[in-house]
Swiss-Prot record:
Induction: By cytokinin. Functions as a response regulator involved in His-to-Asp phosphorelay signal transduction system. Phosphorylation of the Asp residue in the receiver domain activates the ability of the protein to promote the transcription of target genes. Type-A response regulators seem to act as negative regulators of the cytokinin signaling. This is Two-component response regulator ORR7. One of its GO terms (biological process) is cytokinin-activated signaling pathway. The keyword Transcription regulation applies. InterPro entries: ARR-like (IPR045279), CheY-like_superfamily (IPR011006), Sig_transdc_resp-reg_receiver (IPR001789). PROSITE patterns: RESPONSE_REGULATORY. Keywords: Cytokinin signaling pathway, Phosphoprotein, Transcription, Transcription regulation, Two-component regulatory system. Residues 92-205 form the Response regulatory domain.
C-alpha cells in the first residue's frame, strides 16, 4: 500500500492531462455509448447517485470454446454454454462516487462501461454479486463517506476480503493514514491516472 504524493496538474475533471480530458473529448463518449457491445456489465445502485460494477476483461475466449463444442442434444448444449459462461465470468470492480464525471473517468480507465442512475444500495449489491472483486470509492460523499463504507465492508465477515481503494482530491495525510489503517488497499489522489488503475487492477488479478 502506498501513500500518494501531492496532487498536480489536471483540469479538475478527474482526468490526468494529455488528451484524455472528459470535457468535450471523444474518448469518453465512446465508452459511454458502450462501444464494446460484447462486454458484460452489471448496473447497481450506490451510496449516492450511482455505483457501477465494471468488468475488467471479457470472456470471449471461453464463449468461443463453447461454440466449437458439439453435442447431439441441443438442450444440453444450451445448459452447458450457460454453465461455462458463469464459470468464465470476469472479475468486477464497483465504482462508488457522487460525481458523475469521476464515475465516468474510472469507467473509461477500466475500459468497460454501461451505466444509469441509481440509489443507495451498494452494500445490498455486494451481498448478492459474487463477482465483485474490488471496490473503488470516493472518500468524501454525502450521506456516507468512503471511509464509512470501508469500515462497514471490513466489519462484514462476508465482504471483508474484497479490496477497497479510496479516492480523494484532497491530500490529507491523517485521512490517508486512517483509511490505510482501517484496511484500504490503496489511496488514490485525483486526478486518477491510467497508471494508478493499471497498478491496482494488475495486483488484484494476480
Amino acid at each position: 500500500m502506498r501513500v500518494p504524493a501531492a496532487v498536480t496538474g489536471g483540469c479538475g475533471c478527474g482526468v490526468d492531462g494529455g488528451g484524455g480530458c472528459c470535457r468535450g473529448g471523444g474518448k469518453l463518449a465512446d465508452w459511454e455509448e458502450g462501444k464494446d457491445d460484447e462486454m458484460k456489465s452489471v448496473v447497481v445502485k450506490g451510496w449516492t447517485r450511482m455505483a457501477q460494477v465494471v468488468p475488467l476483461h471479457d470472456n470471449a475466449s471461453a464463449e468461443d470454446d463453447d461454440d466449437d463444442e458439439e453435442d447431439d442434444d441441443e438442450d444440453d448444449d444450451d445448459d452447458d454454454d450457460e454453465d461455462d459462461e458463469e464459470e468464465a465470468a470476469p472479475p468486477y470492480v464497483m465504482a462508488v462516487d457522487d460525481s458523475s464525471v469521476d464515475r465516468a473517468v474510472i469507467t473509461a480507465l477500466l475500459r468497460r462501461s454501461k451505466y444509469r442512475d441509481s440509489g443507495k444500495r451498494a452494500l445490498e449489491i455486494l451481498g448478492s454479486e459474487p463477482n465483485v472483486s474490488m471496490i473503488i470509492t470516493d472518500y468524501w460523499m454525502p450521506e456516507m463517506t468512503g471511509y464509512d463504507l470501508l469500515k462497514k465492508i471490513k466489519e462484514s465477515s462476508e465482504l471483508k476480503q474484497i479490496p477497497v481503494v479510496i479516492m480523494s482530491s484532497e491530500n490529507v495525510p491523517t485521512r490517508i493514514s486512517r483509511c490505510l489503517e482501517e484496511g484500504a488497499e490503496d489511496f488514490l489522489l485525483k486526478p486518477v491516472r491510467p497508471a494508478d488503475i493499471s497498478r491496482i487492477t494488475s495486483r488484484m488479478l494476480q
